Amino acid sequence: MKLATKKIKTLGKSKPDLSKKKPAKDAIRKTKPQTTSETKVTPRNPKQKVAEPVKNGKTTKKGFKKSHKEELEGLKDIDPEFYDFLKNNDKKLLDFNLLDTDDDDDEEGDEEDKEDTVTKESKDDEDDEEKYHKPSKDLEVASDESDFEVDEEDDAAAGGIQKITLNLLHQWEQQLGQANISIDIVRKVIQAFNSALASISADGADGGENKHNAAAFKVVGAAAFNGVIQLCVIHLQPAIIRLLGVRPNSSLPLHKHKKWVKVRGCLRYYLTDLIRLVEQVSSPNILGVLLKHLHQMAGMVVPFSALGKTILKRLVVLWSTGDETVRVLAFLCILKITRKQQATMLNHVLKAMYLAYVRNSKFVSPNTLPGINFMRRSLVEMFALDLNVSYQHVFLYIRQLAIHLRNAVILKKKDSFQAVYNWQFINSLRLWADLLGASANKPQLQPLIYPLVTIATGVIRLIPTAQYFPLRFHCLQTLISLAKETNTYVPVLPLIVEVLKSNTFNRKHSAVSMKPVQFTCVLRLNKGQLAENGFRDEVIEQVCGLLLEYLAHESTSLAFSDLVVPTVMAIKTYLKECRNANYARKLKQLLEKIQESARFIEQQRGKSSVTFDIKDAQAVAAWEQQLRLKRTPLDVYYASWLKTHETKKRRQAAHTDEINADYDVPKLKKLPVKTGVPVRNENGEVELFPSDSEDEGDDGLHLGSDDDDDEDVQEEEEVEVEHPKAKKAKKEKPEKQKPRPATVEDDYDEAGGAVDIVKDLDLNEW
């Protein structure tokens, strides 16, 4: 116990010894620079407390290393062999400079830590006072005018990259307009164009083959970008023409000039960038400008076959899916590029354009129909460039149509029928019929007329029901156009007259449609449309129009009077059973013109001028040509009908109120909202059928002479039924003034009705 207490006492005595070191630490703290009274002294972290002993230790270690270095230096004189051994086996031991450098770095690090500690406390006041950043009052705002200024500092910082400014572009424009053009300025402009594309690319870098040129210039801002594009589009092509020394009337290709080698490489890069820009642009206006420029550069695409295929591929896409103006410009570019290298490019272009035509003619609507018609006409022009090359394609594609038709006839399944009864098939028939008609004076494609006529006739007879009457009329129109253009007899009259014998057509309609049915963009009708009166009206219009068009063309034939005998008999048979006065009137008028033309032909044949043999084809053709100059009665009637029909078609496409009036469509007046108060006129009398029309004497029905008597009777009955309803409105609010009894004569005058309740009917609302 005594020993234990002694140990405890000794431990207790050791405490004052430790406390003696505190004044030394306080003395060290006092040596630090004093801060202002406003600053707050922050306590030291643990790392700062152990900084001084470490420093002392490093100082001792440095002296030890210094003495060790001297000993090793002395070893070189005392034992050279051992020194060489260390030098060969342990070089680090003798690397005194490396050791000294590490020590110096440690010392410098300690000094920097010490200085940071001092400056940190001295800047506490500034951190508190300037806690928030205060911007300068002399800041400058960037604007588009900075594009005119050359920023030399940016150029130096960018490592030689020159910034495109409007002043620089103006200098280039002047250099491009000079008579003697340097190849260097052309290369600079093309490099600037590449840099402009790199500035708008998705990843911000140039994705083309001219990637190294993009580092030469830097395009910043919309003004600089537009300036570069405008410079290339307007001034580059004329400058290259002057550089090559092309004469105005020279027929020598551009790639055969002497200086072509100098511009070949940069032009290849430029055309690549140009078509890449065309792919990225979606604005029709900008596309139009770029395509016009590409049309000027078409002669420079010839030497680059691979690049030419890429350009044509993109142009075909624009030709088939772009805006109307873009379509036309794309086709002009395709035509110009293809004609300059027709031997190598025509096959690829024809195949690509036909596939694009079929792909984009799958659906036909009033909006897509003009584009499809343009593609068909332009594609006919492309096939007509070389009929020998086109024959292989036309024969192959007509054969594909025949295979689809054969499968439908043999299999008789829904899928096989749908492969034939679709817009792609019908538009293909139209395309080949137009092509054969356009090349009628050349013998290369004439053997394909008979297969095409056979296919079209087979399509009509595949499903001869009333639901597919629109498709039948489309095929008949194609055959009639082919017969007129090729001057070939095609037996379409039986296919037209057959429609009049349809039970569905002759059945009385069970539904009334105010809006007429149009077959222009329709191939098939549903059961509801078959029951409407608009279906029968359109069928009669189509039958009369097709008969008139075909017979007007054949009216100058030597055998016309014999040709129309079956048709005349079929029309007379239908007129005996027809109950609709409108249909009977139209067919009677057509029948009279047919018979009049037949008598005219018989008179011409009975004259003494016909002295040739019927087997003499040339004499028959000459006689028919003279007859065309005299104009047959049916031909004159068809010309007047066609003029009226085309006018109605153009107005129908416009969808205006004036068109509806010209179409004799009745209009409906919208009655005011019923508020329980009867509408009175100026005399205080109740109006049974109020109207907004100011002209009370105008006939608003516009029904004309085409209306049936039965329909007129029904309208009178409807008017008589509505009179009691108007009298009920009179009883709701009694007045002292007794209204005069309403009669039918009050609302309808001798002209047929001054007040019209169906005057403002808009077809778009139904």
From Swiss-Prot:
Subcellular location: Nucleus
Superkingdom as given in the UniProt entry: Eukaryota
Keywords linked to the UniProt accession: Nucleus, Phosphoprotein
Modified residues (Phosphoserine): 143, 146, 691, 693, 705
Any one annotated GO CC term: nucleoplasm
GO-annotated biological processes: negative regulation of transcription by RNA polymerase II; ribosomal large subunit biogenesis
Biased composition (Basic and acidic residues): 14-29, 130-140, 757-766
Modified residues (Phosphothreonine): 101
Record field: compositional bias (Polar residues): 33-42
InterPro entries for this protein: ARM-type_fold, Noc2
A Pfam short name: Noc2
Region annotation (Disordered) ranges: 1-73, 100-154, 674-766
Compositional bias segments (type: Acidic residues): 100-115, 141-154, 706-720
Segments of skewed composition (Basic residues): 1-12, 58-67
Disruption phenotype: Ubiquitous RNAi-mediated knock-down is lethal between first and second instar with reduced larval size. Conditional RNAi-mediated knock-down in proliferating cells of the eye and antenna imaginal discs is viable but results in small eye size and disorganized ommatidia, possibly due to excessive apoptosis. Conditional RNAi-mediated knock-down in cells of the prothoracic gland impedes pupation, probably due to reduced ecdysone hormone levels.
UniProt GO MF annotations: histone binding; transcription corepressor activity
Similarity comment: Belongs to the NOC2 family.
Protein name in UniProt: Nucleolar complex protein 2
Organism: Drosophila melanogaster
Gene: Noc2
